[in-house]
């Protein structure tokens, strides 16, 4: 809209009611008829038609990698801005302020029950501070209060839907079968109006072949993998199919900046939660990764929703 385009919005089917409420606000703003349009329904039907329509010139999408790939295939030749999945590596180096790293990690993994593309998904912790980090983050996880999200005393609400919860179940099960140690949580919680409440979970002794180390869990989980050096962490980030965001903790700012430059991610936070980002800065995945293409944030999204035109004039 800000770039001068008419918009057709197809929200996730599970958020249709919220989308309608927002659309009502937009209608109340008295935009000209036809400038903003809302179409609800299954993405495989409604979204597919919108993406493939000859009248659609550019597509912006935030969601799963699998859906993003389908959109890219259907929208061949059109401008794309795709912000997709991540495996948010959080790196705790040997000189880190462990207390600060723990508090930031709790936010990274348990804010919105871990249902964020910027959530902490894999914790690469140096062996020198591993035990302290593990014990402290487990204590914080056990102190998280589950409940009604509208209750001010609640720290964490439920997962969004059954497929998300089932994926959390699968990642925990797979990790434990492959030798991970369950330090905290690890199961759904009964006694709530829905079976989608999940214990804040901490896993230790995570290894590279586990699903939780390779894929996006999208749940309240802290999977810890021990590293012996910065190079170990950088190699793990390099090998990941994702490349959206990373975080690193160190008391040495110069070291943190060197790490940020070397890490193959579209965004790196130094001594801050992976969930922290500034909306005016460019945000998106590294080239060739499963995390998307293009950049959201401030003026940078305009690159995908405007035409760059060259005009040559002969003044002779």
What is each stretch, according to the model?
Residues 33, 53, 84-86, 116-118, ...:
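Short glycine-enriched loop/turn motifs at secondary-structure junctions
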Residues 39-42, 62, 108, 250, ...:
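Conserved residues at the C-terminal ends of beta-strands
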Residues 1, 8, 37, 81, ...:
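Structural detector of well-ordered beta-strand residues that form the stable sheet scaffold
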Residues 19-22, 50, 71, 133, ...:
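Hydrophobic packing residues within well-ordered alpha-helices of enzyme cores
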Residues 31, 56, 91, 145, ...:
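Conserved C-terminal structural/oligomerization subdomain of aldehyde/semialdehyde dehydrogenase
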Residues 58, 66-207, 230-231, 270:
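ALDH superfamily catalytic-core signature
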Residues 19-22, 36, 86, 137, ...:
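Hydrophobic alpha-helical packing residues
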Residues 1-100, 227:
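Rossmann-like NAD(P) dinucleotide-binding subdomain of oxidoreductase/dehydrogenase enzymes
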């Amino acid at each position: 809209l800000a770039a001068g385009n008419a918009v057709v919005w197809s929200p996730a089917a599970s958020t249709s009611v919220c989308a309608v409420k927002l659309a009502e606000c937009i209608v109340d703003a008295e935009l000209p008829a036809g400038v903003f349009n809302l179409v609800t329904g299954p993405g495989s039907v409604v979204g597919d038609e919108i993406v493939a329509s000859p009248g659609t010139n550019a597509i912006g999408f935030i969601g799963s990698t699998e859906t993003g790939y389908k959109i890219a295939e259907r929208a061949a030749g059109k401008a794309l801005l795709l912000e997709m999945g991540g495996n948010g590596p959080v790196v705790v180096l040997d000189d880190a302020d462990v207390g600060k790293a723990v508090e930031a990690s709790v936010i990274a993994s348990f804010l919105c029950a871990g249902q964020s593309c910027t959530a902490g998904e894999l914790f690469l912790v140096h062996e020198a501070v591993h035990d302290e980090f593990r014990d402290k983050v487990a204590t914080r996880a056990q102190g998280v209060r589950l409940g009604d999200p509208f209750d001010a005393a609640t720290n964490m609400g439920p997962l969004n839907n059954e497929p998300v919860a089932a994926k959390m179940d699968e990642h925990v099960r797979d990790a434990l079968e492959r030798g991970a140690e369950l330090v905290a949580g690890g199961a759904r919680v009964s006694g709530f109006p829905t079976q989608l409440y999940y214990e804040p979970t901490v896993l230790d002794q995570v290894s590279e072949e586990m699903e939780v180390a390779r894929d996006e869990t999208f749940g309240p989980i802290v999977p810890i993998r021990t590293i012996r050096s910065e190079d170990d962490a950088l190699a793990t980030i390099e090998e990941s199919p994702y490349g959206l965001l990373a975080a690193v903790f160190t008391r040495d700012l110069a070291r943190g900046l060197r790490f940020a430059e070397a890490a193959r991610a579209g965004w790196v936070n130094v001594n801050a939660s992976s969930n922290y980002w500034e909306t005016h800065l460019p945000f998106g995945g590294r080239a060739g990764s499963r995390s998307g293409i293009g950049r959201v944030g401030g003026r940078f999204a305009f690159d995908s929703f405007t035409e760059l035109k060259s005009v040559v004039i002969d003044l002779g």
